[in-house]
């Protein structure tokens, strides 16, 4: 009983501490969306340049998650994560202090690589701390760090802009805060129950941590990931999930100002509402997966993507003169739905690949997700320039439906890849 109590206490501490650190990864990459309108107004960068920068950043981030997924399965997750957030802090500070367009691109692309050092170690550590039967619920709770990080970025940057500090401070202040969080990460996050000094988690059909490190080869890890049909399907679906998600998140304040005539500060608050609804949607999706679908997250994702398409279509159809509260509700509905699949894909991948290859599986699904920035970045910029924001918003609904169809193809898959 005492051992179980000690484990639960250490588990809770790990979930909270790692979630706090990951929220600051989000702070140091989603701050750009609030700085964009100011940068465009000053003329230091163009819409196409921002779109291109977002696309390249996303691709580099996806590659980083994929490559670092291999390393994170082998190295200490706490140290790996600490180095990542420290380097991201540095890139933000450098970005805020430059005025050259080429350096904007260089620092933000490098930030994309350092950002990819955040989730792979978390995916690995979470599977060592949480039993597969609880993973959907508890990892969904952990996954709200994405939304809280985005809310922190939007709220903090809205405040900095409101008091007249200018867009540069949207990078300098988050960079300084992230540097402090790197110290917190090194001392407070624990890689595994063994590092925290508590009993190791036992999983039926799984291996002890020491045994896993000693016996699982690179080829076996690759087989667990690339030989699994479900992982391929959810990776492809993730491409479309992220188009919709980043379409709203990266361009939200900009299209609200240009398409709906809503000031940047109010647009930032509306995007915060989008993220807060995402927190509830993420937790609800995890609970539904464990309680209703017995761990089969792809079934939850099917319904989430269907309703995400409906809310995206509704936002496009809403007249320009409609009250702000109607636009806010539709944004919140889209956020509630789209973040469920975003969280569950990582959980499904970890369960399907087992804890022996969880980081590699999440690296693979991650790179597929962030290849979507070719569409959500420069693609959206192209559609907006030639056809207007209405066409761009309508396309989000179409992409959501394509993602839903891919999840449907995995409807009958088992909940995990562990051998019974």
Q: Language-model segments: what does each one mean?
A:
Residues 74-85, 291-305:
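Cytoplasmic membrane-interface "Motif A"-like loop-to-helix N-cap segments
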Residues 142-193:
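Helix-loop-helix hairpin linking two adjacent transmembrane segments in secondary transporters
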Residues 107-148:
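Cytoplasmic helix-loop-helix junction between adjacent transmembrane helices
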């Amino acid at each position: 009983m005492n051992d179980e109590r000690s484990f639960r206490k250490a588990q809770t501490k790990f979930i909270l501490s790692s979630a706090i650190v990951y929220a600051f990864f989000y702070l140091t990459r989603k701050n750009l969306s609030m700085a964009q309108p100011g940068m465009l107004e000053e003329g230091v960068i163009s819409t196409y340049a921002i779109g291109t920068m977002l696309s390249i950043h996303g691709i580099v981030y996806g590659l980083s998650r994929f490559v670092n997924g291999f390393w994170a399965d082998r190295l200490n997750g706490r140290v790996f994560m600490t180095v990542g957030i420290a380097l991201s802090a540095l890139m933000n500070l450098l970005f805020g202090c430059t005025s050259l367009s080429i350096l904007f691109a260089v620092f933000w692309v490098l930030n994309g690589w350092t950002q990819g050092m955040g989730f792979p170690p978390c995916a690995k550590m979470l599977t060592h701390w949480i039993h597969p039967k609880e993973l959907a619920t508890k990892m969904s709770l952990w996954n709200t760090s994405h939304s809280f990080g985005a809310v922190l970025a939007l709220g903090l940057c809205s405040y900095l802009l409101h008091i007249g500090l200018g867009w540069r401070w949207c990078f300098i202040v988050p960079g300084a805060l992230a540097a402090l969080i790197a110290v917190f990460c090194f001392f407070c996050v624990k890689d595994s129950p063994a590092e925290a000094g508590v009993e190791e988690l036992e999983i039926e059909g799984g291996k002890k941590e020491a045994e896993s490190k000693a016996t699982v080869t690179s080829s076996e890890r690759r087989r667990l990931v690339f030989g699994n049909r479900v992982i391929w399907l959810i990776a492809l679906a993730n491409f479309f999930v992220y188009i919709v998600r980043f379409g709203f998140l990266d361009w939200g304040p900009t299209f609200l100002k240009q398409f709906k005539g809503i000031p940047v500060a109010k647009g930032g608050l509306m995007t915060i509402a989008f993220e807060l609804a995402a927190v509830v949607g993420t937790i609800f999706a995890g609970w539904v997966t464990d309680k209703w679908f017995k761990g089969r997250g792809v079934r939850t994702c099917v319904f989430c993507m269907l309703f995400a398409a409906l809310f995206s279509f509704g936002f496009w159809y809403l007249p320009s003169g409609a009250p702000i509260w109607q636009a806010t509700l539709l944004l919140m509905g889209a956020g509630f739905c789209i973040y469920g699949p975003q969280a569950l894909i990582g959980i499904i991948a970890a369960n399907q690949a087992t804890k022996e290859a969880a980081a590699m599986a999440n690296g693979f699904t991650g790179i597929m997700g962030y290849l979507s920035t070719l569409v959500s970045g420069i693609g959206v910029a192209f559609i907006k320039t030639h056809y207007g924001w209405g066409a761009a918003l309508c396309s989000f609904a179409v992409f959501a439906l394509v993602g839903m169809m891919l999840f449907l193809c995995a409807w009958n898959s088992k909940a995990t890849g562990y051998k019974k």
